[in-house]
């Protein structure tokens, strides 16, 4: 099995377009929306980063940091978003290492706490995330769990 390489988009700006296309494919959010959030990170205008794991030149996992991940708790910011690991790489700690890298970079920039919304239980707690309440999804679709990492 190929070795895993973890990097931020700042470390590999040539991955801007492939990363935006990959996130679009996984989540259905327009590619342009990802590019609009990735470019300020690349230019240094924002510390809200994008993180990738590569295996043999292919993206094996990724996540980003944005102001708000489509919920009504706008006061809980920033948010980890778009956490995804390709099925063949699950169970190898890919998401955990990406989460740790994002939290560490944000903390180094003086940004803490960090939040995320998810319906998963038990996974994020393994990486130091603490359940802190519920938020209503944008559009009123339902409630989702909110986690915090200090």
Which residues make up each language-model segment?
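Helix-adjacent hinge/juxtasegments
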Residues: 69-77, 81-88, 92-94
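Conserved acetyl-CoA-binding loop-helix of GNAT-fold acetyltransferases
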Residues: 85, 91-104, 116
């Amino acid at each position: 099995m190929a070795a895993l390489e973890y990097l931020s988009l700042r470390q590999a700006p040539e991955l801007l377009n492939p990363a935006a296309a990959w996130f679009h494919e996984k989540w259905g959010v327009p590619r342009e929306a990802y590019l609009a959030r990735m470019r300020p990170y690349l230019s240094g205008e924002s510390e809200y980063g994008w993180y990738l794991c590569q295996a043999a030149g292919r993206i094996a996992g990724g996540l980003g940091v944005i102001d708000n991940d489509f919920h009504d708790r706008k006061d809980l910011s920033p948010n980890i978003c778009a956490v995804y690991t390709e099925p063949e790489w699950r169970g190898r700690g890919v998401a955990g290492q990406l989460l740790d890298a994002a939290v560490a970079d944000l903390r180094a920039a003086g940004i803490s706490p960090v939040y995320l919304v998810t319906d998963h239980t038990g996974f994020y707690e393994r990486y130091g995330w603490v359940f802190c309440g519920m938020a209503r999804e944008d559009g009123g679709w339902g409630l989702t769990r909110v986690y915090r990492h200090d």
